[in-house]
Curated annotation (Swiss-Prot):
Protein name: SPX and EXS domain-containing protein 4
Keyword Transmembrane recorded: yes
Residues that span the membrane, as ranges: 536-556, 573-593, 622-642, 654-674, 703-723, 776-796, 803-823, 854-874, 887-907
Composition skew (Acidic residues), residue ranges: 244-264
Taxonomic classification: Eukaryota, Amoebozoa, Evosea, Eumycetozoa, Dictyostelia
Domain annotation EXS: ranges: 738-940
Segments of skewed composition (Basic and acidic residues): 319-336, 1013-1022
UniProt main location, coarse: membrane
Feature: compositional bias, Basic residues: 942-951
Length: 1081
């Protein structure tokens, strides 16, 4: 069985967000090693210390390069990461500190690629020229005036190197000449962080920085010219410009705008990428850059020497040559060092000045208003990798597990303290209170079992992921396994099992007469047994079959036996009663289906609706009761239709729907504990709270109930408005009678009451929170309905024309109100269409419960259609003489209201869940029925404990004083030992007598205190679980989860080890990549 299926089968719905994200970790593994090591489709990380010196590798001998490759770098200093991406057109100039440009592999027609990494450079040097071992010439800039001159420069380069191997005595002059030539190159302005360089005269030349081995290989086709896109993205970076260049440009020409596509800020373990798009604000970029500037003094000082030297060499500002020629004389080395130092002092900045220069250039970039026009957006993204995601997932599971264990332990201690409280209080020692304590032990035992299953399932998932990752990277996998084994969820001695064992024995001691076997049977999970589930399933299936049969019979009798031409006299009222009674039945049935989906999808609807968590509930049971009422409704309707075909019974037909409504009301309000009495009472309480608005606080269940009442009012209001407002003179007699009800003042008032209750709730919420959105925004939605209802009444009462001013106003209010209601449904209640600029998932939310987004788009479309259903009815009314009071038409219209209310509540609960996942997965305490008395008892107990501690302290002080007196007397006795023996014996006997008299009050005092605290003797009846210091039941043991400093240090060191090994492994994987090999010339 796959772990994915195992996780879905055993997951606890309201803990769904706390489990291991197995699919996410698997996707990271597949994404990180997709087709590796044969392609570079994904972005990888390499060491800056190695890639940045790629162009100066010729300064070192082959032996030195080999030693560096084996050691993994030039030195052991921290490294800066740059991103490798093969989508660009040409190799880039890595700019340290701020912009780490992309180093790319540019494939030519013959497959030639550029090289990155010392290992391939080492092999290529051996292939090209075995005589380069003694070379010490500095790197020359290969200046490509056009693509045809590349091979000439390469040949001249090798000729020069071969000549230098034969003439060792003139190395010093060559070094000086090369330094002077490189110093002259400092006047060049690097215009693009890729490969576009500007000459002093402002002309653009396509140049390649570095050695011939970083350019296209010998024998390959000429290098193509820069693409128009690259030329368009030319920039003048002040970070790559010396002070001399800046002075010249201030005199001669203006600085060009800076266009940055990507800034990578490296903060050791945190790699932050700043991406600029066409939209955004300058403040975001300034904020991000300032945040990075603050980290420079901490991180860059360690890297400044190496990176700045490499940067200066890479940009043409050469500090000097590192000569590794073993055959050179010591005098030549000294001369070279002196000359190099002189050149460095004259032409370059020291490390501190270089650091100050770079920070000042950052500020210059931020303060340049013209350049900021091209950097209008800045978003921070964190690069994803497996090791970081794995550590985050482990920490999430571990912290949640330990937190819930400690919460459960606190509840167990509280329940144990209730036992002596109830044993001494006869008035509160009722069956209900005793059952509360017993149920509390059972709930905590079941909760601990769930925690243990949660731990085992997550550990199994982590092991599965590590086994998969071990095939790709054994080093990092072993480090991650060490980190997992050091967490608290991986401990062998589980405190959860110990606490479960203690709860079981306490339950056996106080509730089953020390019968542990009986306690085990009673304390097990309280879920419905298989027999009850099978009974529910059988009943549901039977009721569904009965409903289908009765529904078919109703349709058949209505078409063939119902008198359509001469219906009963009271048929409009009868059909209205049937429709009104059907709406709450269908809403209750749909709620049972919604609760089933919520439970399966992990939405904690129990907490959102504020149901009591200690009550047993099942969506199947709700569905069963809903189907029972549906069956009764279909029976009554079938009886009415069948009886209407007989003329003798038509006079009494109105009694059938009336009796059915009365029976339904009686069942709903009857006080006996049958037919889900807790749910029925909960509904009645919420209806009372809705009616009491705005004088009572409003919670989410009250909002839910007001929506249910709104669906009834919306139904009555829409039907009467559409049928009666227009073409009143052309209505049939039955329709006129139907519309006359709307002209009665009481009916519009009744229709407006649900809207008024909803407005009152919104204003109450605004009074409590002072938030205009979403409370006043939601109230406006109901205000539109009230205004339309008032205009409807006025139009029926005073206007007889088709298009009077009042009717036009009514029509306009309905159109505007429908659009606004749709917007409020989406934005206020479902959380859609919000934050266009910052929400990447617009028009949806960022957090969604269901992964298939088409579900939400279907819901949006359906809500829009249902909000404009009145317009469809209006079109039918104006375009035909179809009777809109037809029972079948009104029945289907009522179904649309049920669909709207069901869909609205379903996604409203889903939005409420995802917007506050931490709140709705929190630990909820069941209220104590005797909380006030118990709190008073605990307060008195704390006071007695404090008095007892004070007494014990005073007694200890008295004992210490007595002991000091005895010691003083003993010293006197030893000092007077020269006297006669009789005196000595007398003093000693008197001291012993005094000592005995001083100790007896302490013993008496202890006995007195024990008698004085005899009222606490009931606490000692469970002395095997008592804490001798506090008097509370003790659940502490040596086996417990700790958050000490040693544990945190171990975790921190393991995280550092994972990060260090990951950087080395990534470097080795990239440097050994086949796509990075240099093709032979």
């Amino acid at each position: 069985m796959k772990f994915r299926d195992l996780l879905n089968d055993h997951i606890i719905s309201h803990w769904r967000d706390k489990y291991i994200d197995y699919e996410y970790l698997k996707d990271l593994i597949d994404r990180e090693y997709h087709n590796a090591p044969n392609s570079l489709n994904n972005s990888m990380m390499i060491d800056m210390s190695q890639s940045i010196n790629n162009t100066i590798a010729e300064q070192y001998s082959v032996n030195d390069i080999s030693s560096m490759v084996t050691k993994g770098g030039i030195n052991d200093s921290p490294t800066t990461d740059i991103e490798v991406d093969e989508t660009a057109d040409s190799p880039a100039i890595p700019s340290p500190i701020i912009s780490h440009s992309n180093i790319n592999s540019n494939n030519n027609n013959n497959g030639g690629t550029n090289s990155v990494g010392f290992s391939h450079l080492h092999r290529q040097l051996n292939r090209q020229n075995s005589n380069l071992k003694n070379s010490s010439n500095s790197i020359n800039l290969l200046k490509a005036d056009d693509s045809n001159n590349i091979e000439k420069h390469v040949k001249s380069y090798f000729d020069q190197r071969n000549n230098n191997n034969n003439i060792n005595n003139i190395n010093n002059n060559n070094n000086n000449n090369s330094n002077n030539s490189n110093n002259s190159n400092n006047n060049k302005t690097i215009k693009n962080t890729r490969n576009i360089i500007a000459d002093d005269d402002g002309g653009n030349e396509d140049t390649t920085l570095g050695s011939p081995f970083s350019s296209p290989s010998i024998g390959s086709p000429p290098m193509s010219s820069p693409s128009p896109k690259m030329l368009k993205q030319e920039l003048h970076s002040p970070l790559l410009t010396s002070e001399k260049d800046e002075d010249e440009e201030e005199e001669g020409e203006e600085e060009e705008d800076i266009e940055m596509e990507q800034l990578e800020l490296d903060d050791h373990d945190k790699n932050t990428t700043i991406n600029m798009t066409a939209n955004g604000s300058r403040g975001n970029l300034r904020k991000g850059m300032n945040q990075f500037v603050k980290t420079i003094p901490q991180n860059i000082k360690q890297l400044n020497s190496q990176i700045s030297n490499s940067f200066l060499k890479f940009g043409g500002m050469v500090k000097g040559d590192k000569s590794n020629d073993k055959n050179n004389d010591k005098s030549n080395d000294k001369n070279n060092n002196k000359n190099n130092k002189n050149n460095n002092n004259n032409n370059n900045l020291n490390d501190e000045d270089n650091f100050d220069m770079m920070t000042s250039q950052i500020e210059k970039v931020l303060n340049n208003k013209d350049n900021m026009k091209l950097m209008e957006s800045c978003t921070f993204t964190t690069k994803e990798n497996f090791q970081t995601a794995f550590v985050d997932q482990v920490n999430k599971v571990d912290s949640f597990f330990v937190e819930r264990y400690r919460k459960t332990k606190e509840k167990c201690v509280e329940l144990c303290n209730m036992i002596p409280f109830l044993s001494t209080n006869e008035q509160l020692r009722t069956i209900r209170n005793i059952e509360f304590v017993k149920q509390g032990f059972q709930d905590n035992y079941h909760y601990l079992e769930s925690l243990e299953a949660f731990k085992e399932l997550n550990i199994k998932g982590f092991k599965k992921v590590l086994e998969k990752y071990e095939k790709k990277n054994r080093i990092i996998s072993s480090e991650c396994r060490k980190y997992l084994e050091n967490t608290r969820i991986f401990e062998n001695d589980s405190p959860v099992r110990f606490l479960s064992h203690r709860i079981k024995h306490l339950y056996a001691r106080y509730f089953t007469g020390n019968d542990v076997k009986l306690a085990s049977n009673q304390i097990k999970t309280y879920a419905e047994d298989e027999r009850f589930q099978k009974y529910n399933l059988f009943t549901i299936g039977l009721l569904i079959g009965v409903c289908i049969v009765l529904g078919i019979q109703v349709v058949f009798n209505y078409y063939y036996y119902y008198p359509h031409e001469q219906p009963p006299i009271d048929s409009p009222l009868a059909w209205l009663l049937f429709r009104i009674s059907l709406l709450p039945i269908l809403l209750g049935t749909m709620f049972s289906l919604m609760s089933f989906i919520w439970e399966k999808s992990g939405i904690n609807y129990v907490f959102i609706f504020e149901f009591k968590p200690d009550h047993k509930r099942s969506p199947g049971r709700y569905l069963k009761y809903g189907l029972i009422f549906n069956t009764l409704w279909l029976l009554a309707l079938n009886l009415y239709i069948d009886s209407s075909s007989h003329q003798n019974t038509t006079r009494y037909l109105i009694l059938i729907p009336i009796v059915f409504v009365l029976i339904t009301l009686i069942i709903g309000i009857q006080p006996f504990p049958i037919m889900a009495h807790r749910t029925r009472f909960w509904v009645l309480k919420k209806i009372v709270k809705v009616v009491s608005a705005p004088w009572v606080p409003v919670r989410f269940p009250d909002f839910f109930m007001s929506v249910q009442l709104l669906s009834l009012g919306e139904f009555l209001f829409n039907i009467q408005s559409m049928v009666c407002v227009f073409n009143y003179s052309a209505l049939d007699p039955e329709e006129v009678k139907f519309c006359s009800q709307s002209r009665f003042f009481a009916l519009p008032v009744l229709n407006a009451l649900p809207y008024w209750w909803r407005v009152a709730q919104c204003f109450r919420r605004y009074y409590e929170t002072r938030q205009f959105f979403p409370h006043i925004t939601s109230a406006i939605r109901s205000i539109f309905s009230i205004i339309a209802l008032v205009l409807n009444y006025i139009a029926l009462e005073y206007s007889q024309h088709d298009w009077s001013i009042i009717k036009i106003a009514w029509f306009g209010i309905n159109v505007v109100g429908s659009f606004y209601k749709f917007y409020a449904d989406m934005s206020v209640d479902w959380g859609f269409f919000n934050n266009y600029k910052t929400n990447p998932a617009w028009p949806l939310r960022e957090k969604l419960v269901f992964k298939k987004k088409w579900i939400y788009y279907v819901a949006i479309t359906l809500d829009f259609f249902l909000r404009f259903t009145w317009l469809i009815i209006f079109s039918i009314r104006k375009g035909s003489k179809h009777r809109l009071d037809n029972p079948l038409f009104l029945f289907f219209f009522s179904l649309t209201e049920v669909v709207w209310a069901t869909q609205f509540i379903f996604f409203r609960v889903e939005s409420e869940h995802v917007q506050s996942p931490d709140t709705y997965s929190s630990f909820q305490d069941i209220p104590i029925p005797f909380s006030q008395e118990y709190n008073n008892y605990m307060d008195e107990k704390k006071k007695r404990r404090k008095r007892k501690q004070k007494q014990s302290k005073s007694n200890n002080n008295n004992n210490n004083n007595n002991n000091n007196n005895n010691n003083n007397n003993n010293r006197l006795h030893h000092n007077d030992s020269s006297n006669n023996v009789e005196t000595d014996e007398t003093i000693t006997s008197s001291n012993n007598t005094d000592s005995s008299h001083q100790k007896q009050p302490l013993t008496h005092n202890r006995h007195h205190n024990h008698n004085h605290n005899h009222q606490d003797h009931h606490d000692l009846s469970i002395n095997d679980h008592m804490n001798p210091d506090t008097g509370d039941i003790n659940f502490d043991s040596k086996i417990d989860y700790k958050d000490d400093e040693a544990y945190n240090l171990r975790q921190s060191s393991l995280r550092t080890s994972i990060s260090r090994n990951a950087s080395h492994v990534d470097l080795g994987r990239v440097s050994s990549h086949n796509d990075l090999n240099i093709s032979r010339g």
